[in-house]
Curated annotation (Swiss-Prot):
Alphabetized SUPFAM superfamilies for the sequence: Terpenoid synthases
Name of the protein in its database record: Bifunctional lycopene cyclase/phytoene synthase
Keywords attached to this entry: Carotenoid biosynthesis, Isomerase, Membrane, Multifunctional enzyme, Transferase, Transmembrane, Transmembrane helix
Biological source species: Sporisorium reilianum (strain SRZ2)
Reaction catalysis annotation: all-trans-lycopene = gamma-carotene; gamma-carotene = all-trans-beta-carotene; 2 (2E,6E,10E)-geranylgeranyl diphosphate = 15-cis-phytoene + 2 diphosphate
Subcellular location: Membrane
Pathway info: Carotenoid biosynthesis; beta-carotene biosynthesis; Carotenoid biosynthesis; phytoene biosynthesis; all-trans-phytoene from geranylgeranyl diphosphate: step 1/1
Residues covered by region (Phytoene synthase): 262-685
Gene Ontology MF term list: geranylgeranyl diphosphate synthase activity; intramolecular lyase activity; lycopene beta cyclase activity
Similarity annotation: In the N-terminal section; belongs to the lycopene beta-cyclase family. In the C-terminal section; belongs to the phytoene/squalene synthase family.
One GO CC term on file: membrane
């Protein structure tokens, strides 16, 4: 047997120093992964990047020193810088850099899923995989200890086995059933790829280093089994189990934070990817409590609950996917907690809009549905901070209240289910969104309904640009304020519900852009300024929407949102024609009017372009304010969402004569959406 204290002459000479190995294999990959992930890194992700390398370093250091002391590994002196204990400094660096690589890679793969969708209530099946996993790990621990006898061929294999079994037992107990509940697409596949991809990469790097003598595995303490040429089975096992530990830890963090987010706190938001104060001992106490308890306690029944039923959340997100591909795609860039909140908020807006516009026939039925929506808002806010102090909270769950309200309404069951789910899902947001903002949105829907009023004198007719801005404030500017309030609240800086925002937006605006001006969001004036810009952005994007849909709104809905004072003198009758649907669209052949009495789409186009110029002016002034959002991944997602939607204006400008004549809506391809989103996220344009 080769003596452990003296290297063999048969071992390869070192032609690659450990430092150069890192420059070739680990540092470039880590840098690339960090640059790609940087715009999306939440406070939870940063916690993983801080805590996991520290834990890995502490757990591995004594074990690695023992391994090297017993000559399972060997390093040529001229290939390393210096040692601390028995281990080269570059090896300590490897502990950290591998943890960063695997954690960043796992973050990029798993950020698209919503962990809160997969929390399950306590049941005997809760630990159906965890218990066997712990038993297997403990068995491996015992066998590893028996095999880890110095100066034997099983030593290195046994050391890896017992050393990895303890953390794996703990982490698999906390994550394996959670991953299983997520299914193949959201859980098992990302989990496997998160483990295997860095494992294969590190196997390749290990072969490269072993062939060049950067380090050497002592044959006397190895099984000398080489599934891959030059790569001992112990090295393959080491990188596999270390990546398995790191990925299990990432999923365990996600599960614990998802559980914590269900809690209700009076003076602070629940722990989430957007709010995770690492400097507070209370954070670690809550995380540990979440680790050891059931995934989902009974859901709170009041509107103050911090959580959303997974079934309601899934239904709301399905509404979002069907209603707006652009918003749904851009929302994927948000942290999963904000994607949950803003997705539910947008879903309720869409459901309410559909109840008023699409799911009822006739003005009377639509007006009745508007009253139902108003009653739903009242029911949601019955237990909110805005409710009268002397009023006792209702014992009836929010979801049941809404179901009761919808029961007598003549709507399809699917519509009722979607409405109830979306409404119940916004209940946790009542602590951040004032009730009056929902009423403001309903005022905009009322204006839409008045387009159909039988009395011509009472029908909606926008006279001035101020009227158009007022309408846009109601249906879009208010949504911008809501979203901003939710983001600030979830990040720990809740806006007082009584704070009202100036609704005066001059077109063209005389207010300066916010570029280069840092806001102090602890000051009411600066918070007001940010909310104002959020409203201005909402109005800007609504004008894009109106410009895109001038022809379809006229043909399908008999509506015209262009104000009277926008039309040139020679087009004085165009507004009446658009309100009557008298527009010469090639694809429409049902009209009995002569061609000369119809408005030509090409004549309408100039007003669409004029409206786009107004929109672009507001957009250019409001866009810099996104940099003031105190949450980097939220900034990335909002920049992408706003940029993608504003780019529809560019598609309108690029429409062909045929597109215009046929009244086609300008649309963006998935490729164009992706390019715009990437440009906004990484380059800010």
């Amino acid at each position: 047997m080769t003596r452990l204290y003296q290297p063999s002459q048969d071992w390869p000479a070192c032609t690659l120093s450990y430092r150069h190995f890192h420059l070739l294999w680990t540092l470039p990959l880590c840098a690339v992964l960090f640059l790609v992930a940087r715009p999306f890194l939440t406070k939870l992700d940063r916690a993983k990047l801080i805590l996991l390398p520290i834990i890995a370093f502490v757990w591995t250091t004594p074990w690695d020193n023992l391994i090297v002391k017993n000559r399972a590994w060997f390093y040529h002196r001229h290939c390393i810088w210096f040692t601390i204990g028995y281990v080269p400094i570059e090896e300590y660096f490897f502990f950290v850099i591998q943890s960063l690589i695997s954690t960043l890679w796992c973050t990029l793969l798993t950020r698209w899923a919503l962990p809160n969708l997969y929390l399950v209530p306590s049941s005997p099946k809760r630990r159906r995989l965890a218990t066997p996993a712990v038993v297997v790990c403990m068995l491996c621990f015992v066998l590893g200890l028996k095999a880890a006898v110095p100066e034997t061929h099983s030593y290195y294999f046994g050391m890896i086995t017992w050393w990895s079994s303890l953390p794996l037992a703990l982490l698999l107990w906390g994550s394996v059933d959670f991953v299983s509940n997520m299914g193949v697409r959201a859980g098992l596949a990302p989990f496997a790829l998160s483990v295997l991809a860095p494992t294969f990469y590190l196997w390749a790097s290990d072969v490269y280093a072993l062939r060049r003598g950067t380090w050497h595995i002592n044959e006397a303490t190895s099984l000398n089994v080489f599934p891959i040429p030059h790569l001992p089975i112990e090295e393959m096992l080491f990188f596999l189990v270390t990546n398995l530990i790191l990925v299990s830890a990432c999923f365990t963090f996600d599960r614990c934070v998802a559980i914590c987010r269900q809690s209700v706190a009076e003076n602070a938001p629940p722990l989430s990817p957007s709010y995770l104060p690492l400097g507070s001992l209370d954070t670690y106490t809550k995380l540990w409590a979440a680790f050891v308890r059931s995934d989902r306690p009974p859901v709170a029944t009041s509107a103050a609950s911090a959580s959303v039923e997974p079934r309601d959340l899934a239904a709301s997100l399905q509404v979002l996917r069907a209603a707006s591909k652009s918003f749904n795609a851009a929302s994927l860039l948000l942290p999963w907690d904000l994607r949950t909140d803003l997705g539910c908020l947008y879903a309720f807006c869409r459901v309410a809009d559909d109840l008023v516009d699409d799911d009822a026939q006739g003005l009377e039925a639509k007006s009745s549905n508007l009253d139902v929506i108003r009653a739903i808002v009242d029911a949601i806010y019955a237990d909110s901070p805005e409710a009268a102090p002397q009023k006792q909270p209702s014992a009836q769950p929010v979801s049941d209240r809404i179901r009761t309200l919808l029961a007598p309404v003549a709507l399809p069951d699917k519509v009722k289910q979607d409405t109830r789910a979306a409404a119940a899902s916004i209940a946790p947001l009542t602590r951040y969104i004032p009730k009056r903002l929902w009423y403001e949105m309903l005022q905009g829907y009322s204006l839409d309904l008045l387009f159909e009023h039988p009395d011509a004198d009472k029908r909606t007719r926008l006279r001035t640009m101020d009227d158009l801005v007022e309408y846009s404030q109601c249906v879009a500017g208010v949504v911008g304020e809501m979203c901003t309030r939710v983001i600030l609240g979830r990040c720990g800086g809740a806006v007082p519900l009584e704070l009202k925002v100036d609704r005066t937006i001059a077109v063209p605006s005389t207010k300066a852009a916010m570029a280069g001006k840092a806001l102090d969001l602890t000051r009411a004036d600066d918070v007001h300024a940010l909310l104002y810009e959020a409203r201005r952005m909402g109005v800007s994007l609504q004008l894009v929407n109106i410009a895109r849909d001038i022809v379809p709104d006229s043909v399908e809905l008999r509506r015209c949102y262009l104000p009277t004072d926008m039309f040139d003198k020679q087009d004085a009758r165009m507004q009446d024609a658009l309100l009557a649907g008298h527009i010469a669209v090639r694809s429409q052949h049902t009209t009995t009017l002569e061609e000369k009495e119809l408005v030509q789409p090409r004549d309408v186009r100039k007003y669409a372009l004029r409206l786009l110029r107004v929109s672009r002016g507001l957009y250019d002034q409001a866009y810099p304010a996104l940099a003031q959002i105190p949450n980097r991944p939220a900034r990335a997602g909002l920049k992408a969402a706003c940029s993608v939607y504003a780019a529809i204006g560019t598609r309108i400008e690029a429409q062909t004569e045929t597109d215009v004549a046929e009244g086609r809506r300008a649309r963006m391809s998935n490729r164009d959406r992706m390019l715009r989103a990437v440009s906004a996220v990484y380059f800010g344009v």
